[in-house]
Regions:
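Flexible "arm" and connector segments at domain edges
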Residues: 1-84, 88-129
Length: 129
């Protein structure tokens, strides 16, 4: 599938679901497509997440390397968005696997980030800052 076909498919797929998208709804719908070995679910999902994140990085790298005219740039951004969707799927399935709803992870992450911002510790490294 070439880049233009991939972009068209992504846009068509976006139009199928018309409900308001929530993390809970996404997690439920995504889990209906989950086919992987349940006895190694955590490992499988973590490796899948890493693989898909690598695909995002690869597409961004090629965009930087090759440059693009405006039309090609927009198509490549759509392809990147499609890969981000795959990353999201793995995040949702990992959340399900560890037994914490995705929306709770999202809320907790925002609380953590806002706390760091208020304390001036967004920069730096380490989980406990």
């Amino acid at each position: 599938m070439n880049l233009e076909e991939e972009a068209k498919k992504f846009m068509q797929d976006k139009l199928i679901i018309t409900e308001v998208m929530t993390a809970e709804f996404y997690e439920m719908k995504a889990s209906q497509t989950a086919i992987f070995p349940k006895n190694q679910a955590l490992e499988y999902l973590a490796l899948g997440l890493t693989s898909e994140a690598g695909e995002v990085a690869g597409k961004v790298k090629k965009l930087i390397r090759d440059g693009a005219d405006r039309e090609d740039y927009e198509l490549k951004k759509i392809a990147i968005a499609s890969e981000i969707g795959d990353v999201l799927w793995y995040c949702a399935m990992l959340a399900t696997e560890v037994g914490v709803p995705l929306n709770e992870i999202m809320k907790d992450n925002l609380k953590k980030l806002h706390s760091r911002k208020e304390r001036g510790t967004l920069h730096g490294s380490g989980d406990n800052r």
